[in-house]
Curated annotation (Swiss-Prot):
This is Glutamine--tRNA ligase. It comes from Clostridium perfringens (strain SM101 / Type A). It catalyses: tRNA(Gln) + L-glutamine + ATP = L-glutaminyl-tRNA(Gln) + AMP + diphosphate. L-glutamine binds at D66, Y210. The keyword Iron does not apply. The lineage of its organism: Bacteria, Bacillati, Bacillota, Clostridia, Eubacteriales.
Length: 552
């Protein structure tokens, strides 16, 4: 981290104070995802924050799966999360599952009952909600609140044995139904769920609630700084209450920071799952998705995501980050590393009528104009080439400097060509254009006889590779996740994906999935790992070449 990033990271300052005061000898942080979906860019921010803090202070960072809800969780998500954390460049100190602590949590729940701090409640979910009260009205005590310790122990044991139906009973903490903090109004700490668990199978039919389980997990693992997002700030007193009343030996500290919001991006796992389930996208790794898997398939690099997460900093108030900031960091990374190539994604044939038939020559084109050490690559040139259809207009507007009848342009790395004839089909659509070239104007010869204002790219029609190019726009039209109460599905961009069939120069013949290229004038592209095969080369556009965005 830079000094600016350090000074703005209030969590880092808390850790420094704790270490200086000898409150802790070392720090232990954790990343605790629930395995009920794929990680997204917001989770990446938490991953980077926790692991970088652990690394900076020579501490440890655990990966813990908060798997306390068997109905929504799956091993598919466990494996994808582990893959994503590794891909981002991090190795956890210890791997844990909350479900491995179920026995210990059960013992602590028994302790609360014995202390008169928990009771079994028979109210329905609707009644519990009604009894809870509101922000302006206190709650009402459950008629089951004053059951004896013995009765509560008996009922809780029978809950564990599976004698009761789902939803018929819960275990609640006995705190204060009139507390101004609604989270203190006798929160549920165990519910009945007759469902197989991905890790514990059918051993349990009662499962702890997040507010109860999470502080115990942190305490069991000796976590020193439990870092979470701002929506848990009101839960912190309850977090501390459970640690104290359950008589945990280690006392972790919960610290909240602002979650990541990005323009034109849905960050809710529930909504992302809806996009997948309803077929609006083609899976969790669709390149339009903000999931780590989607960003990886799109072509984002671990370095670009880490740098983005570090640059946005750690704040105490929610804000929204411009999506262009994320794009800035992938451009910055690939500008230095991506090999260059020419590709035509919407091809129009150009015939050079005065170029000898059957002739082919090899031209040398620089790989990176900003880096001479990158060298040059060989590209063939012949009588027939493809150019972009948008690089020709029969009746152009003013200040259009590309090809039109009578105009001359430079072909990148080759010659000047002038348009002399336009060929059309029976519908009046241009099918090819005929040009003449000037052999004296070859690039690299030092020709200065005249200048042209336009340079366009091309590929040799006799030596190129067919390819599919997938061009992406934001999946969400509006700048915020919810706009004036609109359902987010009403904001889906119908033009978020455009598929083009074109050609790329032969230097890409050995391209492998996840290889990245800068395609001249088009942007940065990634070879798609899902759709690419030996006879079908598919490129995802990661980002365009330029943006008006300026990093402050």
């Amino acid at each position: 981290m830079s000094n600016a990033e350090h000074s703005s990271n209030f969590i880092r300052n808390i850790i420094i104070d704790d270490l200086d005061s000898k409150k802790h000898d070392t720090i232990i942080t954790r990343f605790p995802p629930e395995p009920n979906g794929y990680l997204h860019i917001g989770h990446a921010k938490s991953i980077v924050l926790n692991f970088e803090l652990g690394k900076e202070f020579n501490g440890r960072t655990n990966l813990r799966f908060d798997d306390t809800n068997p109905i929504k969780e799956d091993t598919e998500y466990v494996e994808s999360i582990k893959e994503d954390v590794h891909w981002l460049g991090y190795n956890w100190s210890e791997l844990h599952f909350a479900s491995n602590y179920f026995d210990e949590m059960y013992k602590r729940a028994l302790l609360l009952i014995k202390k008169g701090k928990a009771y079994v409640c028979d109210l329905t979910p609707e009644e519990i909600k009604e009894y809870r009260g509101t922000l302006t009205e206190p709650g009402k005590e459950s008629p089951y609140r004053n059951r004896s310790v013995e009765e509560n122990l008996d009922l809780f044991e029978r809950m564990r044995k599976g004698e009761f139906e789902d939803g018929s009973k819960v275990l609640r903490a006995k705190i204060d139904m009139s507390s101004p903090n609604i989270n203190f109004r006798d929160p549920i700490i165990y519910r009945i769920a007759h469902a197989s668990h991905h890790n514990t199978g059918d051993k349990w039919c009662i499962y702890p609630m997040y507010d109860f389980a999470h502080p115990l997990e942190d305490a069991i693992e000796g976590i020193t700084h439990s870092i979470c997002t701002l929506e848990f700030a009101d839960h912190r007193p309850l977090y501390d209450w459970f640690v104290k009343e359950c008589e945990m030996e280690n006392i972790p500290r919960q610290i909240e920071f602002a979650r990541l919001n990005i323009t034109n991006t849905v960050m809710s796992k529930r909504k992302l799952k809806q996009l997948v389930d309803e077929g609006i996208v083609d899976g969790w790794d669709d390149p339009r998705m903000p999931t780590v898997a989607g960003l990886r398939r799109r072509g984002y690099t671990p370095k670009s995501i880490r740098n983005f997460c570090k640059a946005i900093g750690v704040a105490k108030a929610d804000s929204t980050v411009d999506y262009q900031m994320l794009e800035h960091f992938i451009r910055e990374d690939l500008q230095e590393t991506a090999p260059r190539a020419m590709a035509v994604i919407n091809p129009l044939k150009l015939v050079i009528t005065n170029y000898p038939e059957g002739k082919s020559e090899i031209l040398e084109i620089e790989n990176n104009p900003k880096d001479e050490s990158a060298g040059k690559r060989a590209v063939t040139f012949s009588r027939e080439i493809y150019i972009e259809r948008e690089d020709f207009m029969e009746n152009p507007p003013k200040k259009y400097f590309r090809l039109f009848p009578g105009n001359e342009v430079r072909l990148k790395g080759a010659y000047f060509v002038k348009c002399n004839e336009v060929i059309k089909d029976e519908n009046g659509e241009v099918t090819e254009i005929h040009c003449t070239y000037d052999p004296e104007t070859k690039s690299g010869t030092g020709f200065t006889g005249r200048k042209v204002k336009g340079t366009i790219h091309w590929v040799d029609a006799n030596n190129c590779i067919p390819a599919e190019f997938r061009l992406y726009e934001p999946l969400i039209l509006d700048d915020c996740e919810e706009n004036e109460g609109k359902h987010f599905l009403e904001q889906i961009n119908p033009n978020s994906l455009t598929i083009c069939k074109g050609f790329i120069e032969p230097s890409a013949k050995d391209a492998k999935p996840q290889d990245k290229y800068q395609l001249f004038r088009h942007g940065y592209f990634n070879v798609d790992p899902n759709f690419t095969s030996d006879d079908n080369l598919v490129f995802n556009r990661i980002v365009s070449l330029k943006s008006s965005f300026k990093l402050k």
